[in-house]
Structures are given as structure tokens and as C-alpha cells.
Amino acid sequence: MEQPMPAERLVPSLRSRERSPIPGLPHTLTELHLHVGGAVAPHVLFELAHEQGFKLPVRDYFDFVDLVTSNPDKVRNLEDYLRIMHEWTEKIQSSPAAIERSVYEIFAKEYRGSRVGRMELRFNPMKRNLGGERDLDHIIHAALRGLDRACLEYGIRGGLIFCLAREFRADLNEIIVEKAIKYRDRGVIGIDLAGTEAHALELVPESVERFAGIFARAREAGLGTTVHTGETPHTAGEGVIAAVRRLKVDRIGHGIRAAYSPEAMRVLSDEGVTLEVCPTSNLH
């Protein structure tokens, strides 16, 4: 994500590392919503798993692809999709070497495959440190090295968004925000709130107040803000309204249920909040 950008900027990104545009190209695409846990090619995950000595439940590569790939036959809801990430991709990416390569490969793949020259990539660093076994700063530094390498080699512009977790204790989410602020001049450009919407925290007044303080601190430090909400009936249009009015976010992740709420649509329009719509995943 790039910093909260005023309307006159090119795109409503959160916070920009103003990297030079690619010379000679007529245009490039922009990607605002991409997760490290869902964007690494299966063959890269397979290699990373073996490099780290993970004991996988399958030995054949194509069985592994099926294991880490979401499809309508086995993913019936958001919880099913998140389970794939939590059980396998996040675990495989939980080392400095693995997260560095993952970040690099995503940026490189998106540019080579679709000429995405400006991209914001998000992940929860605390879900990449094996519950505290890995040092959090080492994980973050490694991710930033992957970003730097991709930007150097491909001339792209990019930044990292740190995801808070709905299921985390407040003190853990506060640590993530502190790390985002610490590395805001190195390529961390914003924060997000992600996780199962069954934990509809934005609809619980005391939870909203707690997160409002966290998001305010991030904004004051110059970070952009976005929230996953309005993707499922658990949060619906009410979640979108709460995120905009109470958390004062710059953007909304998904937010497709706002389409069923005239009030939510009015709030989005009045406040100029962008929806990070993901047609492929939401249609599936």
C-alpha cells in the first residue's frame, strides 16, 4: 500500500516508496490487494518446503499443488480459504530465507506475467515467526530485502502492508503496528486488519474503540490504513460503515457486501473510500 494519497495522486494507494517509473514503457498496471500467503507460485512453495525440511502430507508435486490451491470444490467460504493459508503457506514461509524469496517471487511474477509495475503486498509478520521461535525483526528485514531486490531488478514501485489479526490479543496487534511504524521509511507503507469475519470486531463497540486507537496511531505516523470487511454476511454493509466512520480507513479490503446496503454505498461515496475489489477470489 502506499501512503494515504490525495485525490490528485495517480491511484488511491496508501503510502508510496517513490521508485522511478520504468523507462520506455507506455504504462504499467497497479495491484493494491495481494497477500503473500496466497500469491506465491506452488512450485516455489514446494521448493521452500523441501529446503526447510518440512514433512509434507503428500510427496507428489501435483498433490502438493492441490493441497495449497483453493478451488470451488473444496473452498466453500472464507474460513475454508483461510485454513489453507494458515495450515500450509504461512508455515512454509516462516523463515527469513523463505519470506525473502516469497516477497521477491511475487513482485517478479506479477511484473513478468501482467506488467504490474506498482504493487502493494500484505502479510502478517507475526504469522511468519513460528509463534515467536523466529525473531520478528529478522522476518521483516528479510521481507524488505525481497522487496528491494525486486524493485532493483525490475524497476517496479512497491511497498509492504502489515496485517493485524482479528484473532490476536490487543497487545500482539499493537506490536505489529509498532513494527510498521519502525520500518515505515524502509518500505512498510500501511496496516490492515484481516482474518475470519466471523470475528466481526468492527460491530462490537468496545473492539472498535480499541482498534480506533491503533489505527489513529498508524495514521499519525504517516501510514495508510485499510480493513478487510464487508466480504461476507458476518460483517456486511454495517462492517464497511463502521470501518469508515469509526476506524477512518483510507480503503476497504473487498467490501463487496456494501453493494447490498444503500447507506454503506453513500458512506463510501461521501468519504471517497476506495474498495479493493478482488473479482477472482470473490466470484469463486
Language model region names:
Residues 2-225, 232-239, 243-247, 251, ...:
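Metal-cofactor-binding active-site regions of metalloenzymes
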